[in-house]
Amino acid sequence: MIIGFGNDLCDIRRIEESLARFGERFIARCFTDIERRKSEGRPSRAASYAKRFAAKEACAKALGTGLTQGVFWRDMGVVNLPSGKPTLALTGGAAERLALLTPPGLTAIIHLTLTDEFPLAQAQVIIEAVASEASFRPMT
């Protein structure tokens, strides 16, 4: 069952301007250490940060809070599964909100897609609640 959906477009030029104007202060305020390492190693640094920024905005929308109610930028971090597929790791207020959204006996899975084509970066987040292994009972 889908319990949340969010979409966001981010202008890469806006992120370039923020990086130039605020530098480390902007990066430290918005991005996790994992995101920073990933983005700093990319040839298109601003596009990488813009995709992650869009992912956070989309996630906040999917959670139904925006960046309010105790949900902060660094509570949402883009990470990659072993397959390479991107997803979001939630901590703090974002994790608490996700727990409130997830029906008892179900487990939340966050699906994330990222893309960019200068000057835009886009992210879509779908939060799905699925039967957890503990609540799964095979039919006999």
UniProtKB/Swiss-Prot annotation:
Top-level taxon of the source organism? Bacteria
Residue positions annotated to bind Mg(2+) are 8, 57
Q: Name one GO biological process term.
A: fatty acid biosynthetic process
Q: Identify a single GO molecular function assigned to this protein.
A: magnesium ion binding
Query: Single GO cellular component annotation?
Result: cytoplasm
Which SUPFAM superfamilies does the UniProt record give? Answer: 4'-phosphopantetheinyl transferase (SSF56214)
Q: Where in the cell is it found?
A: Cytoplasm
Query: What cofactor is needed?
Result: Mg(2+)
User: Which EC number(s) are documented for this chain?
Assistant: 2.7.8.7
- Which EC class does it fall in? transferase
HAMAP family named in the record = AcpS
Tell me, what does this protein do in biology?
Answer: Transfers the 4'-phosphopantetheine moiety from coenzyme A to a Ser of acyl-carrier-protein.
What the record says about family reads: Belongs to the P-Pant transferase superfamily. AcpS family.
Protein name (database record): Holo-[acyl-carrier-protein] synthase
Q: Which organism is it from?
A: Beijerinckia indica subsp. indica (strain ATCC 9039 / DSM 1715 / NCIMB 8712)
